[in-house]
């Protein structure tokens, strides 16, 4: 264990990597960024969630003199990171608004005495007199900026407090190296990070956005509640997050899950701080393995054993979706990212977009219009993800500008079975209804009203608009409304219809005339079946993992975590337990060959896990 005030002198990068982090080699991009930081250069790392960004400043901190300062946006996030570092034998501390005056004084004192190799701080704290005075006394060779996309107004999570970082750096006696890290940054956001942080010719590494261990799927269930219960029933022994668009939906979903017997909890901004903290800790420590939450439960999650993320509603942007879905599988284990889509999600998202910009009093009318247009463009891209029949992984990578194979072979769309059907008659009915509704009203209506009209629904709105008087009223009464909406979306994908991005009205394109008046055939690629649950994943090669042994190791991990009052993943990650179950180490030396087992953790937990493996092996041998 590294003692207070010590540094890893005499150790090379690989020795530190092995001893403190338990990994035999660096991942893509890590060594380049670490070398740049150790040489005093600025750096920008764009790596997917779970790609090892934090190691790029944690490891150099052990080899550099003095103390590395880490700017982190959320209290819960920095607390989890500090807990994990201390558990690995690395002295780390944090300063945030949740600490008492005595705790702050103790942390300031320890920092002055060289007790920490890493100190985490919220950006709001940087320019306070007390912290500035402390920082000016310390040797700070490196400032790491986590979640650096928060500094860009083009990013999906802009935080004005991040703009204070540059002024803080200017107040230091000597400018340290600055390293910025993010998981979701387009080229425009990356340029903003470099410009605003004033990075000097930074070593820039973009390892890509692909997360091969994540399996993406978009489902269109008739009943989201039934589909959600089915999905969670198939994952009862796993931990996961269910993201919802509104606080009301969080309450409804959490209640639904609890009534069905799931140990679920909730998180949204409407809860008081104490309840949010209590619920988050219950989730982190696996007392409540299912969390229903709004996006307020975002960057504060550093839980590595999340096996699935389900979006009950569609998010407002691809950036937000990829960041939230990326909470799954952070330890590299296979994980599911499933989105339950309905056309009503688009309406909800637009309401949230217009409402949030209208409530922002800091914006001028011109700025408000610009923000709304930008958000609507993002929403259109997100809607495209939900409607595409192409590879879902490819769609996401396209959005972030990363080359990829045409198909991944492992997302819901790649695994689905399709057939070509002649939908000319259905297309003519829908296109005719669009034209007749527009001619009657003088404007275009949305997919919901169109589908109700074609189905023959007696809703008050249809009658109020007089659409029940159209010749196309009830033409598709034999089909459920959800099926009609699917055909409408299919015609939009095929270029026969287009949706107004602001008002949501649907109109015909020039291509529609050929179908209506020239009998152009409409051949569509449609799924053979519409599934309420996830599509069956292709069977991988036989796993080397012994599932009963893995279950025994997880049970031991849980008992140790409960005894020590720490989250289970702090003891060992799921990926480490998978490797342990596959390798079945019989000695301490063999245990150190397991990925994620460093010397400190081997010394702390090794005997218990080796005993569990020996007991299992002995029992299994007797039974066989």
Predicted regions and their residues:
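Accessory DNA-binding and partner-docking regions appended to nucleic-acid-acting proteins
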Residues: 2-16, 347-348, 359-364, 374-376, ...
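Helicase motor core with emphasis on the C-terminal RecA-like subdomain
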Residues: 7-20, 24-28, 32-54, 62-64, ...
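Short helix-to-turn junction characteristic of helix-turn-helix DNA-binding domains
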Residues: 37, 232, 283, 386, ...
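Flexible coil/turn residues that form the inter-helical turn or adjacent wing/linker of helix-turn-helix
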Residues: 174, 236, 389, 443, ...
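Short, charged low-complexity linear segments at domain edges
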Residues: 370-400
């Amino acid at each position: 264990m590294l003692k207070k005030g010590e540094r890893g002198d005499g150790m090379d990068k690989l020795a530190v990597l092995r001893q403190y982090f338990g990994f035999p080699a660096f991942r893509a991009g890590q060594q380049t960024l670490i070398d740049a930081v150790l040489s005093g250069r600025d750096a920008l790392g764009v790596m997917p969630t779970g790609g090892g960004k934090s190691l790029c400043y944690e490891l150099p901190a052990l080899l550099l003199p003095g103390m590395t300062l880490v700017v982190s946006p959320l209290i819960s996030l920095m607390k989890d990171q500090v807990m994990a570092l201390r558990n690995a034998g690395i002295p780390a501390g944090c300063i945030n608004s949740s600490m008492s005056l005595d705790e702050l004084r103790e942390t300031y004192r320890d920092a002055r005495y060289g007790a920490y190799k890493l100190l985490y701080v919220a950006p709001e704290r940087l320019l306070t007199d007390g912290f500035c005075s402390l920082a000016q006394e310390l040797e700070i060779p490196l400032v790491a900026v986590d979640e650096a996309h928060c500094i860009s107004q083009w990013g999906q999570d802009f935080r004005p407090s991040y703009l204070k970082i540059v002024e803080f750096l200017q107040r230091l006696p000597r400018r340290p190296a600055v390293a910025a890290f993010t998981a979701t940054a387009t080229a425009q956001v990356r340029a903003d990070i470099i410009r605003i942080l004033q990075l000097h010719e930074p070593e820039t590494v973009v390892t890509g956005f692909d997360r091969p261990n994540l399996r993406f799927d978009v489902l269109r269930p008739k009943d989201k509640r039934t589909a959600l219960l089915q999905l969670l029933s198939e994952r009862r022994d796993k931990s996961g997050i269910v993201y919802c668009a509104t606080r009301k939906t969080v309450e409804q979903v959490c209640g639904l899950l609890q009534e069905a017997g799931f140990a679920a909890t909730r998180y949204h901004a409407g809860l008081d701080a104490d309840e949010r903290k209590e619920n988050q800790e219950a989730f982190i420590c696996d007392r409540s393995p299912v969390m229903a939450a709004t996006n307020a439960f975002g960057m504060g999650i550093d839980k590595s054993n999340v096996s699935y993320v389900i979006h009950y509603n569609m998010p407002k942007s691809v950036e937000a979706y990829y960041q939230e879905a990326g909470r799954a599988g952070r330890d590299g284990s296979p994980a599911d990212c499933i989105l339950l889509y309905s056309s009503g999600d688009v309406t909800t998202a637009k309401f949230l977009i217009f409402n949030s910009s209208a409530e922002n009093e800091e914006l001028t009318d011109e700025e408000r219009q610009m923000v709304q247009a930008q958000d609507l463009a993002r929403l259109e891209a997100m809607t495209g993800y939900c409607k595409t029949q192409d590879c879902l992984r490819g769609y996401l990578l396209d959005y972030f500008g990363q080359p990829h194979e045409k198909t991944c072979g492992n997302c819901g769309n790649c695994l689905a079975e399709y057939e070509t059907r002649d939908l000319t008659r259905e297309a003519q009915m829908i296109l005719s209804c669009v034209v007749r509704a527009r001619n009657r009203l003088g404007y275009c209506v949305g997919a919901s009203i169109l589908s109700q009209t074609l189905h023959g629904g007696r809703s008050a709105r249809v009658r109020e608009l007089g659409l029940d008087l159209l010749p196309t009223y009830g033409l598709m009464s034999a089909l459920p409304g959800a099926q009609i909406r699917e055909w409408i979306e299919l015609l939009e994908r095929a270029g026969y219809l287009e949706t107004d991005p602001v008002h949501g009205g649907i109109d015909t394109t020039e291509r529609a005339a050929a179908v209506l008046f020239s009998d152009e055939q409409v051949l569509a690629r449609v799924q053979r079946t519409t599934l309420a649950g996830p599509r069956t994943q292709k069977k991988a090669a036989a796993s080397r993992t012994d599932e009963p042994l893995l279950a025994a190791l997880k049970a031991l991990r849980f008992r140790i975590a409960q005894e020590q009052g720490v989250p289970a993943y702090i003891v060992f990650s799921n990926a480490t337990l998978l490797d342990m179950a596959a390798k079945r180490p019989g000695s301490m030396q063999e245990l150190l060959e397991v990925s994620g087992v460093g010397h400190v953790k081997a010394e702390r937990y090794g005997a218990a896990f080796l005993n569990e493996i020996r007991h299992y092996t002995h029992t299994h041998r007797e039974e066989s």
